[in-house]
From Swiss-Prot:
CDD domains: Glyco_tranf_GTA_type (cd00761). Coiled coil: none annotated. This is Uncharacterized glycosyltransferase MG060. InterPro entries: Glyco_trans_2-like, Nucleotide-diphossugar_trans. One of its GO terms (biological process) is biosynthetic process. GO terms for molecular function: glycosyltransferase activity; hexosyltransferase activity. Its EC number is 2.4.-.-. It is an enzyme of class 2 (transferase). It comes from Mycoplasma genitalium (strain ATCC 33530 / DSM 19775 / NCTC 10195 / G37) (Mycoplasmoides genitalium). Keywords: Glycosyltransferase, Transferase. The lineage of its organism: Bacteria, Bacillati, Mycoplasmatota, Mycoplasmoidales, Mycoplasmoidaceae. The keyword Glycosyltransferase applies. Belongs to the glycosyltransferase 2 family.
Length: 297
C-alpha cells in the first residue's frame, strides 16, 4: 500500500521540517509513502530547506514542486491536474502542522481492512501553550454514513485520509482566494461512501501562527471570500458548516453591517456532530444565529 502526503507551503521554511519529520520519523516499515511538497510561490528559503532534507532522508520519496502563487485551492488543483498523487490513499498536511506519533500506523491498520474510502481522525488545536482536543465526530461514532452525518464543523484537512479515487473526483477548487480547505473537506466527505472515524487526535493544528489564514485581519477581501465560502457550503448542502463560520464575532459584525442574509433550502441538522457541538450549535442557532438565514421554501 502507498500513501501520498501533499504538503502545500508558502513561506513556511521555519516550520516545514517539523511537518516532514512527523512523517519520516513515524513511517511504518511496510508502508510506502511519497511526500509531495507544493511550493505556492514562496520567496523565503523553503527550496534550500527541502534540498537539505532530501539529502538526509532515504526511507521515503520526497518530491518538490514550485509553482506561481495561487493560494491553497490552486495547490490541490495542481496535484490533480498533473496526476502527481500516485498512492492508493491521499492526505493533506499543511506545512505548519504536524501528525501525531501513531497517526500513520493507526491509519494503515484501518486502511488495510479495505472497507473504507475515508479515514478521519480528531486533532489538537494549539495556541501558545494551550491544547484542545477537537472531536471531528461524536466520540463513539465509528462508521459514518449518510450525507448530512458525514459533514463535520471541524473541516481542516489535517489527519483526514481519502482513497485516491475520491481525491481525483473532487471538483476544481477556487484559486487566488483563501479558506478553500473547508470546501475540499466538504466535497471529499460527500464523495466518500464509507467513512471511518478514529477518535484519537491525529495531529496538531497551529491555527494562530503568523501566516496562517486564520490570523489574517478582517479586511474587505477576506470578508468577501468568507461570504462566498458560506454560499458555496450552502449550495453544496453543507449549511451547518456555514453556520459555524458565523460563530466568529468579527465576521458576524461585518455581516450585520452589510445586512447580509444566507438562503437555505432545508432545516439545520446537527446529528453527526459531537454531543456538545450539537448542543452549542443548536442553542446558538435558535437564540442568536437564526436571523442570518432565510428559507427558500
Amino acid at each position: 500500500m502507498k500513501l501520498s502526503v501533499i504538503i502545500p507551503t508558502y513561506n513556511c521554511a521555519s516550520f516545514i521540517e517539523k511537518a516532514i519529520n512527523s512523517i519520516v520519523k513515524n513511517r511504518p516499515n511496510d508502508l510506502e509513502i511519497e511526500v509531495l511538497i507544493i511550493d505556492d510561490g514562496s520567496i523565503d528559503n523553503t527550496n534550500k530547506v527541502i534540498k537539505k532534507i532530501q539529502d538526509q532522508i532515504n526511507n521515503l520519496t520526497l518530491q518538490y514542486f514550485y509553482k506561481s502563487n495561487g493560494n491553497w485551492g490552486s495547490v490541490i488543483n495542481y496535484v490533480r491536474n498533473n496526476k502527481l498523487a500516485k498512492g492508493e490513499w491521499v492526505t493533506v498536511l499543511d506545512s505548519d502542522d504536524i501528525f501525531s506519533k501513531k497517526t500513520i500506523s493507526i491509519f494503515q491498520k484501518y486502511a488495510q481492512k479495505q472497507r473504507y474510502d475515508a479515514i478521519i481522525f480528531d486533532y489538537y488545536k494549539c495556541w501558545k501553550k494551550f491544547l484542545w482536543k477537537i472531536p471531528t465526530y461524536a466520540r463513539f461514532r465509528k462508521e459514518i454514513k449518510g450525507e448530512l452525518k458525514k459533514q463535520t464543523p471541524f473541516c481542516i484537512p489535517l489527519a483526514k485520509f481519502f482513497k485516491n479515487e475520491v481525491f481525483y473526483q473532487l471538483p476544481k477548487l477556487r484559486e487566488n482566494v483563501g479558506f478553500q480547505d473547508a470546501i475540499y473537506t466538504m466535497h471529499a466527505l460527500q464523495i466518500a461512501n464509507n467513512v471511518f472515524h478514529v477518535s484519537k487526535a491525529g495531529g496538531y493544528y497551529f491555527f494562530k501562527r503568523v501566516g496562517n489564514s486564520m490570523s489574517i485581519p478582517w479586511h474587505s477581501s477576506r470578508f468577501d471570500i468568507e461570504v462566498q465560502i458560506c454560499k458555496d457550503l450552502i449550495e453544496n448542502n453543507a449549511q451547518e458548516i456555514a453556520l459555524v463560520h458565523l460563530l466568529r464575532l468579527k465576521f458576524r459584525n461585518l455581516v450585520d453591517d452589510k445586512k447580509i442574509k444566507f438562503t437555505v433550502k432545508r432545516d439545520f441538522c446537527f446529528s453527526g456532530f459531537s454531543w456538545y457541538s450539537r448542543l452549542i450549535l443548536s442553542l446558538m442557532y435558535n437564540f442568536w444565529l437564526k436571523r442570518y438565514f432565510n428559507s427558500s421554501e
